UniProtKB/Swiss-Prot annotation:
SMART domains on file: NGF
Protein name: Venom nerve growth factor
Region of interest (Disordered), residue spans: 47-69
SS bonds (residue pairs): C136-C201, C179-C229, C189-C231
Tissue expression as described in the entry: Expressed by the venom gland.
Source organism (scientific name): Bothrops jararacussu
Keywords from the named record: Cleavage on pair of basic residues, Disulfide bond, Glycoprotein, Growth factor, Lipid-binding, Metalloenzyme inhibitor, Metalloprotease inhibitor, Protease inhibitor, Secreted, Signal, Toxin
Glycosylation sites: N145
Amino acid sequence: MSMLCYTLIITLLIGIWAAPKSEDNVPLGSPATSDLSVTSCTKTHEALKTSRNTDQHYPAPKKEEDQEFGSAANIIVDPKLFQKRRFQSPRVLFSTQPPPLSRDEQSVDDANSLNRNIRAKREDHPVHNRGEYSVCDSVNVWVANKTTATDIRGNVVTVMVDVNINNNVYKQYFFETKCRNPNPVPTGCRGIDARHWNSYCTTTNTFVKALTMEGNQASWRFIRIDTACVCVISRKNENFG
C-alpha cells in the first residue's frame, strides 16, 4: 500500500514538472520572447511613422515676426473707434487713396476718407505774400508706410499701415513736415544776423493719436512724428577788449 502511494506521488510530481511554462516566465531568447520583441518593435516603428506623417500635415511654426505681421493684416477695426473726436488728429488721415499735398491738387473724396474735417484743416495753410520769406525752408509729405514709431513713453510700437473697416481697406497716412535744408543760406537760417548769432534749421516732433497694434488688438496711442522746421540760434562769443 505504501509503495502504491509513493508511485502515485512520484508520477504526479513528474507530470507537474513536465507541464509547459507560461509566457510570463519564459527566459530571454526563447521563441515567445522573440515574437513579443518583434511585435513591440513593429508597433513602435509604425507609431514613429505615423508621427512623422502627422507632422508633415502641419506646417512648421512661424516666426514671431511673421505671426505679428499676419495678425496685423487680418485685424478688423470697429468703425466706432473713429466716432470719438478726441481720437482724431489733423495730421492723421485714413483713406483709400493718397491725399493731396496742397489745396491746388484735387481733394480726396469724402466717401474715401474717414477724417472728413481733417482734409479741410490741411488745406488751410497760410500763403505768404510776395516778398515774405520763411526763416527755414520746410517740406510737407504724407507718410503712408510707417510701420514703427516711438510712443509718448519712449517705447517702440507697431503702427497699423492698413486698416480693415467694414470690409474696406483704409491706409493710415501721416502728414509730416521736415526741414528741406539745415542751412537755407550759407550763414544758417534766413534773416538772422550772422555777425552776432549762430543759426541752423532743425526738424521738431510732436505727438499725435495713431492706430497701433497692442497684442492682437488695435489701440490708440500717442506716437511721435515730424511736424515742423524751426531755427535754432545761439549767441556768438564776443571778445571784449
